From Swiss-Prot:
Pfam families: Homeodomain, Pou, POU2F1_C. This is POU domain, class 2, transcription factor 1. Coiled coil: none annotated. GO terms for cellular component: chromatin; endoplasmic reticulum; intracellular membrane-bounded organelle; nucleoplasm; nucleus; RNA polymerase II transcription regulator complex. Residues 379-438 bind DNA. Transcription factor that binds to the octamer motif (5'-ATTTGCAT-3') and activates the promoters of the genes for some small nuclear RNAs (snRNA) and of genes such as those for histone H2B and immunoglobulins. Modulates transcription transactivation by NR3C1, AR and PGR. One of its GO terms (biological process) is positive regulation of miRNA transcription. It comes from Homo sapiens (Human).
Length: 743
């Protein structure tokens, strides 16, 4: 710790006017005294006075030397706490000078930052003090009068400097020569620069130059810095940019150039700074934030997703990163350490991606398929736009088949000149849209029960394929249609009980898809004699709709006639016509009309379509069966009603598609309600709503039994099935049995 050259800098820092202080330069005020190569007697006296004020108030230089030794030892102990391995060896007589210098250098422990001009001035002042100290030691060793001379100097120090006489002249040249000799003898001592105590320093972190000149020492220290590991130097320059190399250019002794290095545990192993000073972190965070923002903008401009970046980095650099990691990096949600780790990799990938995107070879198939480029070339797929005409064709295909097979999708794609994957995705999306529009719970299937179209106070029983019979006077029960795949003639029974009412109601029932309301009747009021139900019996695309209504008539219904024209149904073997008359399968229309008890003049045979049949359902023959020979082949058609007695001619209802019940108004026991099935006017029964209109023309005071109409329209593989039944009852309940031929 003995430092003959270092003492020159802090020695003048204790030269202030504070007379009572004995600290090691901690409380001081610099008072630079301009001196040249030689000093005057007055300046020497002033320096001695300042030194006397700092050290002690005695009158003897011997006592001063002793106090200097004590303070220098305490300073050495404080200095050894930071640098414990420093030697302090000096001769007993010559130890006073370096010890005193080291004591005076205590003011530098606080690491004051001095300008070059201040350093030069302190060096000059230190030289002058060193000369005075050398002369004092020489005089002390020569004679015992040294004490008296010291007392004279200390006494004269209190007087103004202009009036101080020097009792013993000091030979400046000899003193300088002696000082140089002493310094040359102490060249083997280590010399250090004391810096701020908050800086953690280690002895191995000082760089000592052995050149005698200050400027050469500075250059040597810079050369030594360049020989440090590159990682440590990067840490040094980043963590301590304000630390500069210091030197003592004016001293002829060894100069010191020391640069403290911030202690970093991982500075030798990783090129990234883990623990950085708090003053430098904001700039690094700002740099990372700016890079993250720039990276996101450039990535989007290139058309890559965050997942593409992670995949490409895994293929190119061997480090797989997820989309979440890239997203958190762009949002600055990663730790500082991970951000620093990702930044160089992302920066490298970004540069490579930009270079590849700008390269013309990227557009060639060979470049796209080359290793390492796959991750970079995978761009975000654009949204497919489908033209209107193609969309209409797809909608039509969807209505036909909602879930086509792979082969059907391929055929559709070839027809529309579209990609198969696009067609497949469109069908998937369209099915999801259909589920949102029509949830599965709202649609009926073959296993769904019969649902009431409108609420009614009368009890409506949802039936199964078995026969359901109700004995209540105000209840109408309907059995649903049997499965449409049945080929045998089956008897279906519709049972109703008659009742009397005092008013007439007009009922309108429109057939419609089962999912929607199929009853529109502003004049229909829920009554004991009116009810409706719908049964949905479907297999694949088959649909069956059953509608039942009861309309009161003003007079007893004596005879009902049904005329059926069908040109598409295949006849099946069944029982012959029973009751009033039995006809062969090839009976003519006139014979059938006569057997039915219908006047041929009411409906001429020429009005019947080819293969038509006229049926008679008398109250006495309601238990009979209809021969399938009376029902020829025809598609489903609309129902028209003809008024008895010619009040409504047949031709007047050809274009309306309505079924009209009307009273004859004449003899109550002779009422006919013929039904005419016209295939030309009623060919859209299963696709468009068809009305069944019931109207009464009699007075409101007449009483009449209830006539029940059971109309069932089915849509099977092709629209070819129909079943129409009219049941009337007078008095007791009777059963009407009809035959239905189903494909």
């Amino acid at each position: 710790m003995n430092n003959p050259s270092e003492t020159s800098k802090p020695s003048m820092e204790s030269g202030d006017g504070n007379t009572g202080t004995q600290t090691n330069g901690l409380d001081f005020q610099k008072q630079p005294v301009p001196v040249g190569g030689a000093i005057s007697t007055a300046q020497a006296q002033a320096f001695l006075g300042h030194l006397h004020q700092v050290q002690l108030a005695g009158t003897s230089l011997q006592a001063a030397a002793q106090s200097l030794n004590v303070q220098s030892k305490s300073n050495e102990e404080s200095g050894d706490s930071q640098q414990p391995s420093q030697p302090s060896q000096q001769p007993s007589v010559q130890a006073a000078i370096p010890q005193t210098q080291l004591m005076l250098a205590g003011g530098q422990i606080t690491g004051l930052t001095l300008t070059p001009a201040q350093q030069q001035l302190l060096l000059q002042q230190a030289q002058a003090q060193a000369q005075l100290l050398a002369a004092a030691v020489q005089q002390h060793s020569a004679s015992q009068q040294h004490s008296a001379a010291g007392a004279t100097i200390s006494a004269s120090a209190a007087t103004p400097m202009t009036q101080i006489p020097l009792s013993q002249p000091i030979q400046i040249a000899q003193d300088l020569q002696q000082l140089q000799q002493l310094q040359q003898q102490n060249l083997n001592l280590q010399q250090f620069v004391l810096v701020h105590p908050t800086t953690n320093l280690q002895p191995a972190q000082f760089i000592i130059s052995q050149t005698p000149q200050g400027q050469q020492g500075l250059l040597q220290a810079q050369n030594l810095l360049t020989q440090l590991p590159q990682q440590s130097q990067a840490n040094l320059l980043q963590s301590q940019p304000s630390i500069t190399l210091t030197s003592q250019p004016a001293t002829p002794t060894r100069t010191i150039a020391a640069t403290p290095i911030q202690t970093l545990p991982q500075s030798q192993s990783t090129p990234k700074r883990i623990d950085t000073p708090s003053l430098e972190e904001p700039s690094d965070l700002e740099e990372l934030e700016q890079f993250a923002k720039t990276f996101k903008q450039r990535r989007i401009k290139l058309g890559f997703t965050q997942g593409d970046v992670g995949l490409a980095m895994g293929k190119l650099y061997g480090n797989d990163f997820s989309q979440t990691t890239i997203s958190r990096f762009e949002a600055l949600n990663l730790s500082f350490k991970n951000m620093c780790k990702l930044k160089p990799l992302l920066e490298k990938w970004l540069n490579d991606a930009e270079n590849l995107s700008s390269d013309s070879s990227l557009s060639s198939p060979s470049a796209l398929n080359s290793p390492g480029i796959e991750g970079l070339s995978r761009r975000r797929k654009k949204r497919t736009s489908i033209e209107t005409n193609i969309r209409v064709a797809l909608e039509k295909s969807f209505l036909e088949n909602q879930k086509p097979t792979s082969e059907e999708i391929t055929m559709i794609a070839d027809q529309l000149n579209m990609e198969k994957e696009v067609i497949r995705v469109w069908f998937c999306n369209r099915r999801q849209k259909e589920k949102r529009i029509n949830p599965p719970s709202s649609g009926g299937t073959s296993s769904s029960p019969i649902k009431a179209i409108f609420p009614s106070p009368t009890s409506l029983v949802a039936t199964t394929p078995s026969l359901v019979t109700s004995s209540a006077a105000t209840t109408l029960t309907v059995s649903p249609v049997l499965p449409l795949t049945s080929a045998a003639v089956t008897n279906l029974s519709v049972t109703g009980t008659s009742d009397t009412t005092s008013n007439n109601t007009a009922t309108v029932i429109s057939t419609a898809p089962p999912a929607s309301s199929a009853v529109t009747s502003p004049s229909l009021s829920p009554s004991p004699s009116a009810s409706a139900s719908t049964s949905e019996a479907s297999s694949a695309s088959e649909t069956s709709t059953t509608q039942t209504t009861s309309t009161p008539l003003s007079s007893p219904l004596g005879t009902s006639q049904v005329m059926v024209t069908a040109s598409g149904l295949q006849t099946a073997a069944a029982a012959a016509l029973q009751g009033a008359a039995q006809l062969p399968a090839n009976a003519s229309l006139a014979a059938m009309a006569a057997a039915a008890g219908l006047n041929p003049s009411l409906m001429a045979p020429s009005q019947f379509a080819a293969g038509g049949a006229l049926l008679s359902l008398n109250p006495g023959t309601l238990s009979g069966a209809l021969s399938p020979a009376l029902m020829s082949n025809s598609t489903l058609a609309t129902i028209q009603a003809l008024a008895s007695g010619g009040s409504l001619p047949i031709t007047s209802l050809d274009a309306t598609g309505n079924l009209v019940f009307a009273n004859a108004g004449g003899a109550p026991n002779i009422v006919t309600a013929p039904l005419f099935l016209n295939p030309q006017n009623l060919s859209l029964l299963t696709s468009n709503p068809v009305s069944l209109v019931s109207a009464a023309a009699a007075s409101a005071g007449n009483s009449a039994p209830v006539a029940s109409l059971h109309a069932t329209s089915t849509s099977a593989e092709s629209i070819q099935n129909s079943l129409f039944t009219v049941a009337s009852a007078s008095g007791a309940a009777s059963t009407t049995t009809t035959a239905s031929k189903a494909q």
